[in-house]
A protein has these predicted regions:
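HhH-family (HhH-GPD) DNA N-glycosylase catalytic core used in base-excision repair
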Residues: 1-193
């Protein structure tokens, strides 16, 4: 077995970025990451988690995922888009999330952009979907960004989205399964054998 795959406490082989002691990351890896979805709230959640991960670690973000879900109304785009300055002030004091005002404001602005953007985020995600014949053989094969992610980020910025650089957009693409970067040998990889 490759060093890019670890065996979890449950005996399942996973991508090595999931530490065996991090149940929040393992749950996200097993149930969400790399699973193709075009559901509006799932797309908004992935986009939001990427905004908050910028400059931090995914472990911190995964540990606060339930807090984000509560703070941002279950990632209901209309409700988040209707949030006010008072709501933002309240969230800056909420210890269940990452209390970064710029990222909270970006999340509200991104919800507003999602409500008005054409083409929609789902349509854009579909247009950038990657079909691979084989899974990456190692973590080293997984890029931080791609030309497709750069183009996708540029389109999102033109629609008013914030905190959407090529690296965070590539992470978004991974999160929603537009690209499946589960490493060969992981039980979620497309070609496990």
């Amino acid at each position: 077995m490759s060093s890019d795959v670890i065996i979890g406490h449950d005996g399942k082989p996973r991508c090595a970025w999931v530490r065996t002691d991090d149940t929040a990351a393992a749950r996200y890896h097993d149930e969400v990451w790399g699973t193709r979805t075009y559901d509006e709230s799932a797309l908004f959640e992935a986009l939001t988690l990427g905004v908050f991960e910028a400059g931090l670690s995914w472990a911190i973000v995964f540990g606060k995922r339930d807090g984000f879900r509560k703070a941002f109304h279950g990632f209901d785009v209309a409700k988040v888009g209707a949030m006010t300055a008072r709501d933002i002030d309240r969230l800056v004091q909420d210890s269940s999330i990452i209390r970064n005002r710029a990222k909270i404001e970006a999340t509200v602005e991104n919800a507003r952009a999602m409500r008005s953007a054409s083409p929609s985020l789902a349509a854009l995600a579909k247009s950038y979907a990657v079909v691979r014949k084989r899974s990456p053989r190692s973590i080293a094969e997984i890029p931080a960004s791609t030309p497709q992610a750069e183009a996708f980020a540029k389109q999102l910025k033109s629609q008013g989205y914030r905190f959407v650089g090529p690296t965070s957009v590539y992470a978004f693409m991974q999160n929603v399964g537009v690209v499946n970067d589960h490493v060969h040998g992981c039980f979620r990889a497309t070609d496990r054998a």
